[in-house]
A protein has these predicted regions:
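Conserved FAD-binding subdomain of flavin-dependent enzymes
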Residues: 20, 33-87, 100
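Short beta-strand/turn micro-motifs composed of small residues
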Residues: 9, 32, 93
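Short, contiguous, pocket-lining structural segments
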Residues: 13, 39, 138, 142
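Conserved beta-strand-loop-beta-strand element in the redox core of flavoprotein oxidoreductases
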Residues: 165-178
Length: 178
C-alpha cells in the first residue's frame, strides 16, 4: 500500500488532520489502538477564550474561535451530527482577588469577559460570597459523538488500522518509509 501520510492516533488532532487530508485528496492511513482513556476521549471538549487566574485572553482567540465554530459545524454537517455548541461559563469567584482580577478585565473591555447581571441568580444552588462573572462565547466540541462517527467513516474508507503503533516496525530509507 502506497500512501502520502501516516497518522498515529485518532484523537482530535488525528481526526482533524485526516479530515483535511481527505478534503485535499491526499492518501493516508491512520493507526489507532482505540485506547479508551486517551485524552481526546475523556476530554470535555471545551474551547475557552480565557485562561488562568488573571483571566487573560488565550493566544489567537479572535482567529481561533470563529475558525473552530465554522470547522466543527462544517464537519458536523457533513457527518449528520451536532459537533459543537455554545455554552458560556459562569465564573464563581473563590476570593476577593479573583473578583478584582476578573472585573479589571471587564473594565479593560476584554472581548470575552462580562459582568454577570444577576449576581444572586445562583445563590439557591451555590455558595459564592464574592460574586460571579461570565465568559463568552465558550464552545463545547461534542467529542463523544464526533470521534466515533469519524472513526466509522475512516473504517468505511479503509483508512483506519485498529492496532497499536509499533515504531520498531517502521523502516526508514533514503527513498521511502515503510
Amino acid at each position: 500500500m502506497q500512501i502520502d501520510y501516516l497518522i498515529i492516533g485518532q484523537g482530535i488532532s488525528g481526526t482533524w488532520l485526516s479530515y483535511y487530508l481527505q478534503k485535499e485528496g491526499k492518501s493516508f492511513l491512520l493507526i489507532d489502538n482505540h485506547f479508551k482513556e486517551a485524552p481526546s476521549r475523556i476530554s470535555a471538549g471545551i474551547i475557552n477564550p480565557v485562561t488562568g487566574r488573571r483571566h487573560v485572553e488565550v493566544w489567537m482567540a479572535k482567529e481561533i474561535l470563529p475558525f473552530a465554530w465554522n470547522a466543527y459545524n462544517q464537519l458536523g454537517k457533513e457527518l449528520g451530527i451536532s459537533a459543537i455548541s455554545q455554552k458560556n461559563i459562569i465564573d464563581f469567584f473563590p476570593g476577593p482577588q479573583m473578583r478584582v482580577s476578573f472585573m479589571q478585565r471587564v473594565e479593560e473591555k476584554g472581548a470575552y469577559v462580562f459582568n454577570y447581571a444577576d449576581q444572586h441568580q445562583f445563590h439557591s444552588m451555590f455558595n459564592y460570597e464574592f460574586g460571579c462573572g461570565e465568559i463568552q462565547p465558550v464552545y463545547t466540541a461534542h467529542l463523544e459523538t464526533l470521534l466515533p462517527v469519524w472513526r466509522q467513516q475512516l473504517k468505511e474508507n479503509t483508512t483506519l488500522l485498529e492496532e497499536e503503533f509499533d515504531i520498531s516496525k517502521l523502516n526508514i530509507t533514503s527513498s521511502k518509509i515503510q
